Design a protein with these regions (language model features):
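Charged/polar low-complexity intrinsically disordered segments
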Residues: 2, 11, 36, 52, ...
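Short hydrophobic targeting helices and cationic amphipathic motifs
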Residues: 3-7, 14, 19, 24, ...
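Ala/Thr-enriched low-complexity intrinsically disordered regions
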Residues: 8, 22, 32-33, 40-44, ...
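Compositionally biased, intrinsically disordered low-complexity segments enriched
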Residues: 25-26, 38, 64
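Terminal low-complexity, poorly structured segments
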Residues: 1-3, 7-10, 37, 41, ...
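Extended, highly charged
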Residues: 42-54, 58-353, 357-542
Length: 542
């Protein structure tokens, strides 16, 4: 497939087409035949950037010239696997400041779009690359997890739940060196600006190298290591910023250092194997280091080196690792940044400066990018399974019986809108589930709406969920508001001066227990019969 970009419905509807230079009936045609097409695509950018977006993109092999013939590890092994199943596209000549972010937004909001790697980025060394949309469809996600590509939604959720319940973490394996140590910058040689870090959204405060990243920290109090996905902005050659929302493990670690008047050691890893990246954004138990959990999932210990300046573990086959200290006594304006709620959720504000002490990187390094967009976008396409499994597990862990399924819906960024299905067992059961589901760890941070339904509802189908709400829930009787719940700076619905807490709407959309035997019977087949009919008679619709 040859990748080109064209404008189908100005000004914001972008598409991917198969033939470079052909006209596809769009209003402007492909940029290859109509150079002004790319101008319309970048109409929201400052005028001085528009000219930089006209570089011709062309397909290339995913391995740069002169690449090593050694067996691939880490992200590169994953790239080989995706290339083998036709899920990877590589293009050259796309500008990091003007166009990579736009193309990524298009990919995130196009069903079944490929993973795309950008190379020969204007102004940067050829071979220094950016990978986006890595886990943007179920086929790539299933392959990454070693599962059948046609696995069902709830089988995938159950797989994640088993991983959370049954996996025995494997301690990381310390090695002296690895691919990550092929190149090391220290002292005056440090230059973060050598990496082709994109401007992901037109109004971002600068380039953010940390989007599809894992940021490694350690608690000063108990030494527990955490790897979380937090945004990281590049200021200049030797300094950056790391924004961590209150309540997150990395922020709790930061507090232990700052409260002692000390800088926090940290490592920004911008190029992990996608499974490691997934783990960094999943609320696994706090006492389990993410790299050890991934090792348990894979059945093989993750090899790490020890950071020279921080002593923190760094995956030996990562692409880029930026080691340094988050200053407790020095701040600089960070942001704004387009966030997962679909808004520039906060203005620029002072945040601690991250002083870089060393940069480790592989030959021909790859930045893994997963910038937030208006949901649903790439992150939700994989987070919805792991977070749904975690939510169900935590409700059951609170001792609540009868929970048959949970779903952290992608339209709410897998945080704002959660649905739980239950088999009602006793009076008040559905209310109990709603209250607990609004406050467990998975749903606590920046939640908004919790809906509890009976187990005859397919909770992944919004039509069925809203049908249950509109036909089984009476607003006065079944809709309750919980106040004083944990929110954060990224909550767009909360006044800028009161971002710490928000309220939760809990909707009991179950049939009323008090007169369950008199509630009207629903028409239509059960979920099981419906699925059987689709499997048996799907050919009728071909």
């Amino acid at each position: 497939m040859i990748l080109c970009l064209y404008l189908a419905n100005p000004p914001n509807d972008l598409r991917v087409c198969n033939r470079m230079g052909a006209h596809h009936g769009c209003r402007r045609g492909c940029p290859a035949t109509d150079p002004e097409g790319i101008r319309a695509m970048t109409s929201t950018l400052p005028p001085e950037l528009i000219a930089k977006g006209k570089g011709d993109a062309k397909p290339v092999p995913h391995k740069p010239e002169g690449a090593s013939n050694k067996p691939a590890t880490g992200l590169r092994k994953w790239l080989d696997e995706m290339d083998a199943i036709g899920e990877l596209r590589v293009v050259e000549g796309v500008d990091a400041e003007a166009s990579i972010g736009l193309v990524t937004e298009m990919l995130h909001h196009t069903e079944e779009s490929p993973a795309v790697m950008f190379d020969a980025i204007p102004g940067y060394e050829k071979g220094w690359r950016v990978l986006v949309n890595a886990l943007g469809n179920r086929r790539r996600l299933a392959t990454t997890l070693g599962l059948p590509t046609d696995i069902s939604t709830f089988d995938l959720v159950d797989t994640w739940q088993r991983a959370l319940d049954d996996v025995v973490p494997l301690p990381t394996k310390l090695v002296e060196s690895g691919p990550i140590t092929e190149n090391i910058m220290k002292g005056d040689d440090i230059d973060l600006l050598k990496f082709p870090t994109p401007l992901w959204h037109p109004e971002d405060g600068g380039p953010f190298i940390g989007t599809g990243c894992g940021i490694i920290t350690r608690s000063r109090d108990d030494g527990v290591v955490n790897m979380g996905t937090y945004r990281a902005q590049v200021y200049d050659a030797k300094t950056a910023a790391i924004y961590i929302s209150p309540g997150k493990d990395g922020r709790l670690h930061r507090d232990t250092w700052f409260n002692a008047g000390e800088d926090m050691p940290a490592v920004i890893v911008a190029g992990l194997h996608p499974l490691q990246f997934m783990a960094s954004g999943l609320e696994i138990p706090r006492n389990v280091p993410e790299l050890e959990w991934v090792g348990g999932v894979l059945g093989e210990a993750i090899e790490t080196i020890t950071g020279e300046f921080t002593g923190l573990p760094i995956p030996a086959d990562a692409e880029i690792a930026i080691e340094g200290f988050l200053r407790h006594d020095l701040t600089r304006d960070e942001g704004p940044f387009g966030e997962w709620t679909g808004y520039y959720a906060s203005t620029s504000r002072p945040e601690p400066v991250f002083e870089v002490k060393a940069v480790y990187y592989r030959n021909n390094p790859i930045i893994l990018g997963c910038p937030p967009e208006k949901p649903p976008y790439e992150a939700q396409r994989f987070q919805q399974y792991g977070r749904s499994a975690a939510l169900k597990r935590e409700i059951q862990g609170a001792g609540i019986p009868g929970v048959t399924a949970a779903w952290t819906h992608s339209v709410g960024g897998c945080r704002l809108f959660n649905i739980i299905a239950i088999k009602q067992l006793y009076q008040g059961h559905s209310r109990q589930v709603g209250n607990i589901a609004a406050q467990v760890r998975q749903a606590n941070y920046l939640g908004r709406i919790v809906i509890v339904v009976d187990d005859d509802i397919d909770i992944t189908d919004l039509h069925e969920v809203i049908w249950a709400v509109t036909t089984r829930a009476d607003p006065e009787r079944d809709m309750k508001i919980l106040t004083g719940a944990l929110s954060g700076a990224l909550d767009p619905a909360i006044h800028p001066d009161h971002k710490g807490t928000n309220s939760r709407l809990i909707i009991d959309a179950c049939r009323p227990w008090e007169w369950l035997d008199r509630f009207p019977r629903a028409i239509g087949p059960s979920i099981e019969v419906k699925n059987f009919t689709r499997d048996t008679w799907n050919w009728v619709m071909d």
